[in-house]
Amino acid sequence: MPRRIDVRKVLMLGSGAIKIAEAAEFDYSGSQALKALREEGIETVLVNPNVATIQTSYKLADHVYLGPLQPWFVEKVIERERPDAILLGFGGQTALSLGVELHRRGILSRYGIRVLGTPIEGIEKALSRGKFRETMMKAGLPVPPSTPATSVEEALRAANEIGYPVIVRVSFNLGGGGSLVAWSREELERWLVRAFAFSGTGEVLVEKYLHYWKEIEYEVVRDQYGNMVAVACLENADPMGVHTGESVVIAPCQTLTDQEYQLLREASLRVAEAIGLVGEGNVQLALNPRDSWEYYVIETNPRMSRSSALASKATGYPLAYIAAKLALGYRLDELLNRVTERTCACFEPSLDYVVVKVPRWDLEKFEGVEKSIGSEMKSIGEVMAIGRNFAEALQKAIRMLDIGEPGVVAGPRYEEPESLEEVLGKLRRREPYWPIWAAKAFRLGASVEQVYEATGVDPYFLSQIREIVEVAEKLRRTKPWSSEFLDLLAEAKRLGFSDEQVALLTGTTVEKVEKARRSIGLDRPRVRQIDTLAAEWPAATNYLYMSYNAYEDDEPITTGRPRLIVLGAGVFRIGVSVEFDWGVVSFADEARRLGYEVVIVNYNPETVSTDWDISDKLYFEELTLERVIDIYWFEKPVGVIAFLGGQIANNLAKPLEERGVRLLGTPGRSVDRAENRAWFSQLLEELGIKQPSWTAASSIEEVLKFAESVGYPVLVRPSYVLSGSAMKIAWSPEELKSYIEQAARVSPRYPVVVSKFLEDAVEAEIDAVGDSRRTVGTVIEHVEPGGVHSGDSTMVIPWFSLPETAVREMIRIAETLNEVLEIKGPFNIQFLVKDGSVYVVELNLRASRSMPFTSKVTGYNLMRAAAEAALRGRISYGFNGADGFKLLRPTGWWGVKSPQPSWQRLRGAYPGLGPEMRSTGEVAALGRTLHEALLKSWLSVQGNRIPPAGSIVLIYTPTGRGSSDLSQAAKLMTEKGYTVYTIEGMEVDGAEPLPLEQALRLVRMGGVGLLMTTDYAPQRDYRVRRLAVDLGVPVVLDARLARMLAEAINRVGLENLEALELREYWGPNVEPF
């Protein structure tokens, strides 16, 4: 059937900011869907406040609205744009829940908007726990014993009837938000209130906990005529009770018999049929490891999901693209497989390789957080590795995590002295990165059975890890360079060992291991092509990986143009997110426009850059020195771009250059001078540029003497780190000693710098691109003071309180550094401004986290300028002849970027701001005034809302700092009709004080609509902040932001927030990008 012709304009809802459980996989799936719609000539309207994504650009969408994903704002967009239809399946749970709410309020019917894909009724059947259970039972599909509950009392009764242990699941949620496993009534009662706070419908499901059952997922595609295929089977190595987002996941399934595979596949197809799926859905099932015929259907997601993104990249089957086409009315057999360009979309992929996904956590950044993993997602990102066997793929995946481990064995966690009982304790508690702890347990003499009892991981996977350990320990015992050693080395390479691992195990150097490897004919791994059908049909794309388990290269397709390699950002973690992927994809576009063949190296399954049609060649590979050099010598490019991939790529710049790799852009020696804190501080002194007083930490005694001379507080900063890792403000000698030790552990090879911390300074920065003579950029002012990491700050363009003299000095410094360091690409300088003086804090000679925001607010694509600077040596874009600094300063509009925290997801963590970054994503909005842009941006952060008039607002200061701003906020909120309270001992003027216990009771009873506070003082107010975030109360954590927000609520209000398209602010003379 041809597609429906009554759809000419489609509204698509994005997923908003990157947050735990809802990350860049939706940027990828949404981008694919927009691409599919554009191919069909359909006009698209996108609502998504995530300024950092490729999706919110005119490359894909016809109309882009940065604004809150809330019904009132989306209705304003609908009123202006009048779309024919809406797509809900490509923006995660945020888009689905919002779509259901638009339907319930009658907004969709009022404007005659049709829902494409799975109908609302099907969405509700899938996402309401009670309705899903009924639907499955009606379809004759088994579900675990369970009871829906709408109150704490009902849930406790249900658990008594079912019997402990139980798992509590929340309706209309994702990432296991609010879910829990309870082994007793006391444990259940303790966390139920929090579970209900996560539920959008006030409903939870109390279900029998299936201890150590296997968790299997199928990705199902179905058209509206009932044709369907199971595109992928994903096996969770972790058992039931560990959220799939927290689990090690393998494709294809490794431990199922054919009987089990077909049984569960058939069940998955019946689930899709039962809910009326149209497009793509994920079905999760539990299989009893002791009885092949006993299984249960656990849940389904009638939308693109994290697993869908993984399945797409693992199989080469473009699930989101196909799902969007099916939503338009196509049949499966009418659509082509875009990898082979010969077979149709109704062919189920077949894999001749193994894919392993491993999550990445950043729990050490959060004080008080619960460290074990379970039914609720806490991981920030994930990696995907491809190998010819499980061991090879797993070793690659561990390296890709960028946690300082060279693989499953030989790293610091594996080598640190511990007893077997200590290691088994970590496995029982489910501490992150269990494959390393399992390997260590085997090294200490544990049996497969012992590790299985501690983890519930199938013995097959455990035996593969034990094999890695056996080879590692043999290497350790064998005389280097003997014939036995060389045989072992060949075996180790086939099991995914890196040269660094072998060197660590044998006490030799990487160079010697490499020489030995070459002597036995292993010059490099072979290049393999992903074709989706196990080589039955030739592939028409360059989707590649490398393996030592192959004897010849697949021949990639070449264009004949000069070739360059672009290094991606790797795994997402706090500080590295989709902003860097925006840079990679935007730069790749510009490089191709300038006539280059672009080869991207990256391994993040969530990203647009790892989509095989973004570049001329994609290597889904490690970003390690060994692998990048392998690719470099095979591809023979004109050079490598390392300034777009965040800290991973930046840290590779110098070692790559030392190995003869040609870096394009800013020279490696300049990068080294900027990243090494001590060297950079010396450079600033030579240039006469002010900086806070500093010293390099050569000994604790010297540092303490320095701190005494300049006075506390002081700032401790390691080198070559991102997101402020181990960056701390020390207020006493005891704190300083502790922080120096932490910083030395994070960056052991480089100096730790200690500098005077300037209290109450304004923080500002310049985002720019330079070519050594020309500089183009903008000045950004932070709302929060210096001392709050830039990634956690509210950013404003143009500046709003900086003196013009300070801005001129910042521009002068940028021009000087551009010339002196021979910059040829993007850079970012961070400043502190105090009493009119400008101090440089740091310089990053790479694309910054804020560059998508800068570009989209100003209407100037910094990546286009970066491509010209790096590849042509000269920026022409936007220049009319003269050199110097081109200042990008919007007139008539403002842009505000707000951080997206994930406090609620991180049970136990203290919500507070400081020099180490803790937010997981960002949003932005534009407005005609600063207050309009600020309010719109703040409301775009998930969980933020303006409480109804008459609600209670709690405002206090735990340290006494910020009391003036908070008092003004209290006065303004009172004027607006709110009841404002403060806390005794932490009072602010203009609010009625309450004893701490009474304030806690008020929060617990749901009486507080907004909390405003400041500073980082867990010993003073941990309970108030933690309870507020657990119960979903919006929290403002800085005094100046609280005051400005109160002004915005007073002056603007929801009714006056405009819904304008991005380019309406830019004006007609800006070329959309």
UniProtKB/Swiss-Prot annotation:
Gene Ontology terms for molecular function: ATP binding; carbamoyl-phosphate synthase (ammonia) activity; carbamoyl-phosphate synthase (glutamine-hydrolyzing) activity; metal ion binding
Per UniProt, Mg(2+) 4 binds at: E842, N844
UniProt: Mn(2+) 1 binding residues: Q284, E299
Where in the numbering of this chain does the MGS-like domain appear? Answer: 944-1073
UniProt-annotated binding residues for Mg(2+) 1: Q284, E299
Which pathway does the database say it acts in? Amino-acid biosynthesis; L-arginine biosynthesis; carbamoyl phosphate from bicarbonate: step 1/1; Pyrimidine metabolism; UMP biosynthesis via de novo pathway; (S)-dihydroorotate from bicarbonate: step 1/3
Q: Does the keyword Transport apply?
A: no
Q: Region annotation Carboxyphosphate synthetic domain: residue ranges?
A: 1-402
What Pfam families has UniProt attached to this entry? CPSase_L_D2 (PF02786), CPSase_L_D3 (PF02787)
Keyword Ligase attributed? yes
Q: Which PANTHER family match?
A: CARBAMOYL-PHOSPHATE SYNTHASE [AMMONIA], MITOCHONDRIAL (PTHR11405:SF53), CARBAMOYLTRANSFERASE FAMILY MEMBER (PTHR11405)
Which protein, by its recorded name, is this? Carbamoyl phosphate synthase large chain
What organism does the record attribute this protein to? Hyperthermus butylicus (strain DSM 5456 / JCM 9403 / PLM1-5)
Q: What is the lineage of its organism?
A: Archaea, Thermoproteota, Thermoprotei, Desulfurococcales, Pyrodictiaceae
